[in-house]
């Protein structure tokens, strides 16, 4: 239900903004991003608990459409930051596809970020969804608590399954599954198949990101619902 409400905001925003989409957020302070902030487990990092990163329209473009911060936190996400000996829930569980608003530097296969990639389509307006179609493009998903940082979720396209890589990790706290929403407004629960997709949360920044995951069917499944190669 939370994801469906977030996805509704993603659908409403371009109606009020010349068809332009929000950006996913790659730095925590990116102008035009759906949310602000950078999450980790550092007790001195205010972003972990500062709901203004979600509710202040200057920081979060979804803010005018979602008046409560609770929508951004999946009830199954039990991660926390310890401050002064007390446990505090962090404010957000979801990440947005880097193909939504770009720049999409993690999309091309390989081990590094390609800031000016021109191979894969970036969706900057809702009218861009016509190919491959909005029902085939994921927008938001539950992200692994030890993977989440800025608002964007990075995953890589797959040209050779044997060279597939996992950049960020999805959550699997729904009995090995994650909630995921699509550009047409529908949401579903995706059951992951490969154990490499589902490392147990450690409530720490110890999870290695951007790792080889050859022939991982989950990496391939998500890539098939991320974007397509440019045709021009």
Positions of predicted regions on the chain:
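Short, well-structured segments within or immediately adjacent to enzyme catalytic domains
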Residues: 3-232
């Amino acid at each position: 239900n939370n994801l469906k409400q977030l996805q509704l905001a993603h659908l409403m925003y371009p109606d009020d903004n010349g068809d332009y989409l929000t950006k996913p957020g790659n730095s925590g302070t990116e102008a035009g991003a759906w949310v602000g902030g950078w999450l980790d487990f550092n007790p001195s990092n205010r972003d972990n608990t500062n709901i203004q990163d979600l509710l202040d329209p200057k920081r979060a473009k979804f803010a005018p459409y979602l008046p409560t911060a609770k929508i951004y936190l999946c009830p199954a996400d039990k991660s926390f930051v310890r401050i002064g000996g007390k446990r505090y829930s962090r404010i957000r569980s979801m990440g947005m596809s880097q193909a939504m608003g770009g720049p999409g530097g993690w999309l091309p296969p390989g081990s590094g970020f390609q800031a000016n990639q021109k191979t894969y389509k970036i969706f900057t307006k809702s009218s861009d969804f016509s190919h491959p179609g909005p029902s085939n493009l994921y927008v938001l998903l539950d992200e692994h608590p030890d993977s989440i940082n800025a608002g964007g979720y990075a995953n890589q396209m797959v040209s050779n399954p044997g060279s597939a890589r996992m950049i960020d990790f999805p959550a699997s706290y729904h009995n090995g599954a994650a909630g995921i929403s699509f550009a047409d407004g529908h949401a579903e629960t995706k059951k992951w198949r490969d154990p490499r997709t589902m490392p147990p949360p450690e409530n720490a920044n110890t999870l290695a990101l951007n790792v080889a995951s050859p022939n991982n069917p989950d990496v391939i499944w998500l890539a098939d619902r991320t974007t397509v190669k440019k045709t021009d």
